[in-house]
Amino acid sequence: GFSLFFFTSFSFVFAQNSINHFLKPADSLNRSRRNVAVVAESALSVGALVSLNQLWYADYPQSDFHFINDNGEWLQMDKAGHVFSSYQLGRFSKELFQWCGMSQKNQLLYGSTFGFAFLTAVELMDGYSSQWGASVGDVAANASGTALYVSQELLWGEQRIVPKFSFHTTAYASARPDILGNSWNEQIIKDYNGQTYWLSFNCHSFIKKSSIPNWLNLAFGYGAEGMITGNAELVNTIFLPESQRHRQF
């Protein structure tokens, strides 16, 4: 019994140490890790674009590439989503390349800009869809998310201001499930009424010598409700007569 306990404990500690060693960022460029990271990130990107095509574009015909001006739609909730997505994708990719042991310069150059590059591909898909179109506002929001990450790395060497996201289901989705989503996994992307985007400020990081705990953050949120369509003038009161579009801070 003792031998089994000792062997089990030793195996657990060894496995834990192996995992910790594997997860620890390399001190210098680890080519095998880099190759794995590039292949994995490429495969995930292609898979995500294929899935997005099925979820978002498959039901609508293709068109010639075109631009639209959607800056006034959805009370800019879609633009907040672009900022968040670009930031988080860039953050994930930068940390992945840090794990590979890439230089700080290359981490920022190839990692942090991944979010912008991926979302530019999505924008191209928008541009060829008859239902949507490429948006300069979306591209600007994507660039803003990337800039938020890169600027903090260059200025402070850490992320003190982090975009965050929360979601709850709403009654609006059932009014237009084709636009706002049929299921929870569709609504979390499509139903802007249930989304909230936050800018979370880590208090301790701004006052290093204070007794403020590291976990304490001050967050400012933005959301909107009452949206059945992108533009207020397109709302058909048959969908939801009591619908009143409004912002929430």
Where is each model-derived feature located?
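Residues that define the transmembrane beta-barrel architecture of outer-membrane proteins
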Residues: 191-197, 214, 245-249
